């Protein structure tokens, strides 16, 4: 209930494991040929070498046991039950394309996969884990670990070189440089430059849809107002004459 609540509130999918059933280290890897998994819904799946997996290491064999398909659905082994006493919380970020392909390959349109394939804020994971832990402490009388595990491999967003003149060229809006800069800043972007009408714009982590200059033009047009775009009647075609 806690992991589902956090997902619905923050948009970050999470998963919980019965800590007493698994053995570290936890390994994230691609599936090997011939591997299988029984998911939480009781269905058996033949895994593809393209599937990204969450695994543990029983008897010291690193990554040898499959716990779930990353970002899609957990396995039956390691699930939390009424007898569970210790919980391992997973709050992670996975590649959109990889998750979408695995979900479709195995016909598992889970709530988690739907969110991952549409893009999840890659800076949200610590906050989601903290929120889940606090809820378990408050309502489940749990005791949080003092040493959470954190593997931070998030890449910084690539800045977009943006010319203010693109707003007029693409959207037909006569918008001054300061207004454009203010709008992009208001939606969370980091804006640098602008003296010669060119900006270096770094989108915020929660806007994975902002990747190209045209995406920024769309944001400016949306916030200035589509009703401000001038209406121009296309010229009528002229028939050729001899």
Regions found by a protein language model. Give the residues of each.
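RNA/tRNA-interacting regions in translation and RNA-turnover enzymes
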Residues: 2-242
């Amino acid at each position: 209930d806690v992991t589902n609540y956090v997902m619905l509130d923050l948009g970050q999918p999470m998963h919980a494991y019965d800590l007493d059933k698994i053995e570290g280290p936890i390994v994230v890897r691609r599936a090997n040929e011939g591997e299988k998994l029984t998911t939480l819904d009781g269905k058996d799946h033949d895994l593809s070498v393209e599937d990204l997996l969450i695994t543990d290491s029983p008897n010291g064999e690193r990554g040898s046991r499959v716990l779930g398909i990353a970002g899609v659905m957990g396995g039956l082994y390691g699930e939390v039950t009424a007898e569970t006493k210790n919980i391992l919380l997973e709050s992670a970020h996975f590649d959109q394309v990889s998750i979408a392909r695995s979900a479709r390959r195995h016909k598992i349109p889970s709530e988690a996969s739907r969110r991952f394939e549409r893009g999840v804020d890659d800076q949200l994971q610590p906050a989601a884990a903290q929120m889940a832990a606090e809820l378990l402490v408050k309502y489940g009388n749990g005791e949080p670990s003092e040493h959470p595990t954190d593997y931070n491999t998030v890449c910084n967003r690539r800045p977009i070189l943006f010319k203010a003149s693109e707003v007029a060229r693409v959207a037909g809006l006569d918008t001054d440089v300061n207004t454009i800069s203010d709008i992009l800043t208001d939606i969370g972007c980091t804006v640098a430059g602008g003296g010669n009408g060119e900006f270096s714009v770094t989108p915020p982590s929660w806007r994975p849809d902002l990747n190209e200059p045209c995406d920024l033009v769309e944001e400016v047009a949306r916030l200035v107002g589509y009703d401000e775009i001038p209406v121009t009647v296309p010229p009528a075609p002229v028939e050729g004459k001899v």
